[in-house]
């Protein structure tokens, strides 16, 4: 259950403080230029330890491609990528060995598996998302061949909403903020929480541009449904909107419907998806992250024996996870769209005839 | 791509105005009492034509079980269920044969497949959800064996929010309203929109109670992620929250974390899921529906040849889809949880030993 | 676990003496002409009750298409087909209700599920293969668009081997014999066994012609491996050969290797598959069927309570199942190749560019 | 398409002369003791370079576990294992860079993908099977907990058949011969072929003992069908028999049926499988390997430009692949049975109740 996708299938493995994390990406068409620098750059964007807004854990996150690439191009065989863990201060975690940190997966992993790798959250750590970013980078390379681009940025921090959405600006922002005008306020909110040994939540806007019409496989592999799954699978995600999302439910049909002219859709309230299929407009989704559960205040909890304890965490944690989450959201959307691109290639007999006849 | 689930796999088929719709449910453990009356009752709850708040289309939605049940019990083989379409006024749709209705899947199906069954939306019609309700009813029967119950109701109509959540009341309400105190206002909003030939949106709260700890398969079959997919796959759904959802992103970590005592979790902001795995609390999700796209006002659109047209729909449509959507949301959550129950049965070696040794 | 295929996915349902059997075929590209007469003809070829060489059970096997076809063409949505059971003499089976027939699945179904639909073997009956033939017929229609043809015939009965392989002749033979010169002997062997209340086994040769190079997905969806699975899943199948099969293992490498010239491969010992991928030559497989387990002699067995019993079957059974098995083998090979055709459409970036750019 | 299994899912990656080969094994229940020495020993059994009967390529095949194991036990998360390639004499292959070796996958990979990693066969090399053996070793550890054992050995070399099947003896034989009395003849046949720069084929018998009744998921995940797929997916495999296999087709039903007494089945012609489900008897399968295609004689072929060439291979190759193939066959059968064990855990409601209630 550690695989994602139907035709472009990512399988990830690895624990926060194990030997390595990594992924196997199966289904990449042969003949794609695999730009390793680009992949590494994507990982560097997600990498912790770069600013005071994120965890101080310093991982170089150097990715190695083990297979599937020959002379710079994909061969059609699975692309395995591995990142060996370096900065694994496992000692930091010895004190929480038998304790369930509130808001964390400790409690559920323990009960589900009867055992847990407690070091840094083990498999449940957001560190796993580095593997997704590596796979997502390959998906982006594939999408680029078709002119499709996926971008993301932070649109809300602690309730402070972006009014403008400048995806280029986000690329340069330490917190991937989409709106330069509220970025300062947003940063202050993060630092204020950090100083109070607390954390804040936020939201990320993800956008794909230049999609062909037709991506998405009704009824149970709809583009919007799979995007929802993909984004909700990111650590700390608690809500997903497609297009106007929740806001659409407060409009009248006559307001919300995207009417059509010769030039295309007049509006894009739908977020580029109708009936689970892309309509050619920008695909827009929003994912909402809870505040980081790792805070440095005393909290009530229990240990594995059911005894009540007071937890006070040590270690290094992001006071705001949505920033790095935006890089992961991009990766997930890229993977979803690339998968849908492959799936849709056989939707019509005429497509197949172009390939074979 | 018309299948859902990994161990309990529902495959649906059928078009709104074709011969029949139906489903095949594979993976139901043998020995389950299959109460056909219960299944039919579930379908009756979703069935249109019962009140002025829903479409006047009258379908008896009589379900026939074709296989997988012998002498009242499941045999472990696939359970096929079929509902023959009766009230198919296909003529109603001849006028939109070549036209793309705004807000509908007409445009995307046409482009994706190069052909569409235009009668009543064909496969993209919400009629398909009757098949889900039939399958969901079987999932509910399975869950009942373990004391797990899934319930849903409407918590918001046209921005009018429920303050109380009375799931028993919802069962008796024509619009499945959770809050009797706002129900009248909510109904008025629907009727007002209907009279204006318009439609409204809303939201549904779904809840599962009495789950064991451990359901959900990280990393890519997380309970919350799959719920998000399941709920977003319902027609007209545009957003999904788990637990506090979006609201959680506006709290501090110290507020949002569910602390733990000997008696259990102090709060349930997480909606019963940590790290993608059920924690034993109620699983809570919310799904937001856009206003019905089928409205009876003039709208701009184009036809299949790219000519601009004015669309004015006829036919019978719900002015508010979330009510019947709540029955579907229940079915989808039941299917997800039942699937997770089966999957989790092999999470520990000790579980397997209970089965085999 | 009642589904087969990855992109062209057949799900079957139904029991021998239940209400109906049928299938849902998902993934058929839109725009394919669906010739219902052809589908019915395929079913008629498999249909029992036509000669003294097969069971006297008379089923009309009238197939109804419930979905996925509009105005004679596939729409891209799942094609559901159903065959209602007519001639269900359930009384024939009351005497074996609690008994395990030797060579049958009675024993294993009972133990696996704790319950069994004993009427005519229930789900384990070869009657299920009618659903495969319906789905296979659609696969054949798809393959025909690419000039690919799948044919089969009986090449051995009770050890009497065909020396010639005339697939056209097989179409006219009551036992689908490939070799007219040994057909009489083969028929005599069947009738002799039948008279002795016994049964015989045999083998079927299946061939696909005119495949493109490239079908088959290494490493775990190889064309030969999936063919082996497909053919071995047919009732009573006990062995599968690809190309020379077992005989190849008794040659030297220098004899067995298919050398290549400008004109193509000099020989086809490989059966058209190298490394799990089609090489453009005819794909050849052989499937070996055990003698029908249903014989009308006294046999030792036990009942569900563990008591020893003497079984003496009544009812109607084929004395030789491979004949009708050859129709099923064709269907299975057609399904496999069609699935591979769809999968291979995304093997190269250049293929995708043909579809999208 | 590089994954195998439904609940115990092995994904392999890597090329013969790339950086590494490896696998990710997902679905291993938590709490299993992972004996790394045992896994390494299994790899050592398959490892080349140990005798004159196998290729001289010397790989240490040192396996590293990267994830999924904590303090010696499985945690329920994916177990990634990697083997870095050491002895990669890529130069050996430069002369066949543009040439299709007869009997190899060069031709088909080239055409399927438009590119190939020609070094040592790339992905199509039998080197990939080392990853299977690693995964299979974990499956064996799981099966051992339930008393199930899987063993294999060579039963035929160049037409020389074993008459006795001594699985313990096979463990000590350089060619994994099952029958000590014909082993010398079999070895001579291999060496004689080797001296003639040729190769021979053979067959392997695989056996699983002590299975519970009930493993196998009809209709399309039958134990025998999936075994056939698993064994046929091994490099150079061309035929698979279950139980008596082909021989059964030459018996009468009255001879072939395994009659039953209180003490169990009187015979085991079926190879332990009825209706696709294990019946508690030994599961028996045979897999037939073609002679190694890599021979050191002149052969006719073409190059990537279609020019006719004479190929004369250099490099190091097994003159007889079935010996090492027997280790792989064991691994594949272990994986299949372990997967079926997990799947069957939910076949009955009563099983689930044992886990949850």
From Swiss-Prot, chains A, B, C, D:
FMN binds at residues 123-125, 235-236, 275, 290-294, 316. Keywords: Amino-acid biosynthesis, Aromatic amino acid biosynthesis, FAD, Flavoprotein, FMN, Lyase, NADP. Its EC number is 4.2.3.5. InterPro entries: Chorismate_synth, Chorismate_synth_AroC_sf, Chorismate_synthase_CS. One of its GO terms (molecular function) is FMN binding. Reduced FMN (FMNH(2)). SUPFAM superfamilies: Chorismate synthase, AroC. Pathway: Metabolic intermediate biosynthesis; chorismate biosynthesis; chorismate from D-erythrose 4-phosphate and phosphoenolpyruvate: step 7/7. Gene3D superfamilies: Chorismate synthase AroC (3.60.150.10). GO terms for biological process: amino acid biosynthetic process; aromatic amino acid family biosynthetic process; chorismate biosynthetic process. It catalyses: 5-O-(1-carboxyvinyl)-3-phosphoshikimate = chorismate + phosphate. Its cofactor is FMNH2. NADP(+) binds at residue 46. One of its GO terms (cellular component) is cytosol. PROSITE patterns: CHORISMATE_SYNTHASE_1 (PS00787), CHORISMATE_SYNTHASE_2 (PS00788). The keyword Cytoplasm does not apply. Homotetramer. This reaction introduces a second double bond into the aromatic ring system. Belongs to the chorismate synthase family. This is Chorismate synthase. It comes from Nitratiruptor sp. (strain SB155-2).
């Amino acid at each position: 259950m550690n695989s994602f996708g139907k035709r472009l299938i990512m399988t990830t493995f690895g624990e926060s403080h194990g030997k390595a994390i990594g992924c196997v990406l199966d289904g990449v068409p042969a003949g794609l230029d695999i730009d390793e620098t680009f992949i590494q750059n994507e990982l560097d964007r997600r990498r912790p330890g770069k600013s005071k807004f994120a965890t101080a854990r310093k991982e170089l996150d150097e990715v190695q491609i083990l297979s599937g690439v020959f002379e710079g191009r994909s061969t059609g065989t699975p692309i395995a990528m591995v990142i060996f863990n370096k900065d694994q201060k496992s000692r930091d975690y010895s004190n929480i060995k038998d304790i369930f940190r509130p808001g964390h997966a400790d409690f559920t992993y323990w009960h589900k598996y009867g055992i847990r790798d407690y070091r840094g959250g083990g498999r449940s750590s957001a560190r796993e998302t580095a593997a997704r970013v590596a796979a997502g980078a390959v998906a982006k390379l594939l999408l680029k061949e078709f002119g499709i681009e996926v971008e993301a940025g932070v649109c809300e921090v602690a309730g402070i909403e972006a009014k403008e959405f400048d995806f280029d600006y986000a690329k340069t922002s330490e917190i991937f903020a989409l709106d330069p005008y509220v970025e300062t306020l947003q940063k202050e909110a993060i630092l204020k929480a950090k100083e109070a040994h607390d954390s804040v939540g936020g939201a990320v806007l993800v956008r794909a541009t230049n999609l062909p019409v037709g991506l998405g496989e009704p009824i149970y592999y709809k583009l919007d449904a799979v995007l929802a799954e993909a984004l909700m699978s990111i650590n700390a995600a608690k809500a997903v909107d497609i297009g106007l999302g929740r806001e659409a439910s407060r409009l009248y049909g006559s307001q919300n419907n995207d009417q059509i002219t010769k030039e295309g859709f007049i509006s894009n309230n739908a977020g580029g998806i109708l009936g689970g299929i892309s309509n050619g407009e920008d695909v827009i989704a929003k994912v909402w992250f809870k505040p980081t559960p790792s805070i440095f205040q005393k909290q009530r909890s229990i240990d594995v024996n059911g005894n009540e304890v007071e937890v006070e965490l040590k270690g290094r944690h992001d006071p705001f996870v949505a920033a790095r989450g935006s890089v992961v959201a991009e990766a997930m959307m890229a993977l979803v769209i690339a998968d849908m691109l492959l799936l849709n290639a056989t939707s019509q007999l005429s497509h197949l005839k172009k390939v074979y006849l």
